[in-house]
A protein has these predicted regions:
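Carbohydrate transferase catalytic cores enriched for Leloir-type hexosyltransferases
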Residues: 1-384
């Protein structure tokens, strides 16, 4: 059986779906060497020696049943050809024969094979005001069309599975739940390992941490206002807020909120943090705060739990499913509730540090890989 996996996000993106795809496929391909894999990706404009391509080369070298197949077109051009112009050029014309196509990034290329489509969330439908208008229009067209062609639909959480059925009418018999995992490098670390990173990145002695894209869905303007409320009147005089992530849609509003509230000395922005540094950054934080308005899973929350960092997160969508009883849940629309939740997490530091890693152990890439192979075999079975 030959499985084609759209590896484009993994080749291009450091976080989000890129990291999800790299972790899932790296855990899956060594498990059953009777399966063959073609990991294809849009390579036009991609630096030939980029870090993620080096990782891909190492994966292929260690697993002879896996081969990489670059397509000499950019992601944008492939999107135009396949999704906007809807040219019926099957992916097999570019990568050769496959039996199963696995598309882990919302949209399905044309194919003659049986198809597995991953839908990570429905932000563009459930919280449309938090999505870029152009991207929203594209996904509103491409995702339902891809769902109609997919044999099975993979989701990251029960919450997303319910959304896919409710919003798009996909029968539950076609939906498969596959929880993401957490890499073992995300774990409690001794201070001796973390303190050099504090100096390297210029991190304050005491800080709250957010990790993710700077965009409206992440609710950062309200988080900054809650931080101002928490520290008003001289409370928590040494506490800072560190926001780590790349700048996304409407990020300017986030920087403007910091200036408007006079917090320039208390809020620190880091650009994208290298994967190798993330476990240490989580460990150094006094608490991790993630008041997102909507998530299909919330991988940074799971990583923080695994590191033993007290977590404050939103009581909506998939997030309660991920954290269980190991975090403080707050109403993401209530600034005062966010501030109160942070204070509670700081006060319950020891309990939450112990609870987080235990909860995180419920999610592993090994379990996800075993589940994915079962799904591949289901797809390979004769059609009913």
């Amino acid at each position: 059986m030959i499985i084609g996996v759209d590896y484009t996000a993994a080749a291009w993106q450091g976080a989000g779906i890129g990291r999800y795809t790299r972790e899932l496929i790296a855990a899956t391909v060594p498990r059953d060497r009777s399966l063959r894999y073609v990991l294809f990706y849009a390579a036009g404009g991609l630096p030939p020696n980029g870090r993620y391509l080096r990782d891909l080369s190492a994966l292929c070298a260690a697993n002879p049943h896996v081969r990489a197949r670059p397509i000499p077109l950019s992601p944008r051009l492939l999107t135009i050809l396949w999704q906007r112009l809807r040219l019926p050029i099957p992916v097999e014309a570019l990568i050769g024969k496959i039996d199963i196509l696995h598309a882990p990034d919302f949209v399905l290329p044309p194919t003659r094979a049986r198809a597995l489509l991953t839908v990570h969330d429905l932000t563009f439908m459930v919280r449309p005001e938090t999505a870029d208008a152009g991207l929203r229009r594209y996904l509103m067209s491409a995702v339902p069309r891809s769902l109609r062609r997919a044999d099975l639909v993979l989701v990251d959480s029960l919450a997303t599975g319910a959304d896919v059925s409710r919003q798009l009418g996909v029968g539950q018999e076609r939906v498969r739940l596959l929880y993401p995992g957490v890499n073992p490098r995300f774990r409690p670390l001794p201070a001796t390992e973390c303190e050099p990173l504090r100096a390297q990145l210029g991190l304050p002695k005491s800080f709250l941490l957010f990790v993710g894209t700077l965009e409206p869905r992440k609710n950062l303007v309200r988080l900054i206002a809650a931080f101002a409320q928490l520290t008003a009147g001289g409370a928590y005089p040494d506490l800072h807020l560190v926001i780590a992530g790349r700048r996304g849609w409407l990020y300017e509003e986030i920087f403007a909120a910091v200036e408007r509230l006079g917090l320039a000395e208390r809020v620190r922005f880091l650009d994208f943090v290298d994967d190798a540094h993330l476990p240490g950054v989580y460990n150094l934080a006094n608490a991790f705060v993630y008041p997102s308005l909507y998530e299909g899973f919330g991988l940074p929350v799971l990583e923080a739990l695994a590191c033993g960092t007290p977590v404050v997160t939103a009581s909506v969508s998939s997030l309660p499913e991920v954290v269980g009883d190991a975090a403080v849940l707050v109403d993401p629309l209530d600034q005062a509730a966010i501030a109160s939740g942070i204070a509670r997490a700081l006060g319950e530091h020891e309990r939450l540090r112990a609870a987080g890693p235990s909860q995180a152990q419920r999610f592993s890439w090994d379990s996800a890989a075993a589940g994915l192979i079962d799904i591949y075999r289901t797809l390979a079975s004769p059609r009913a």
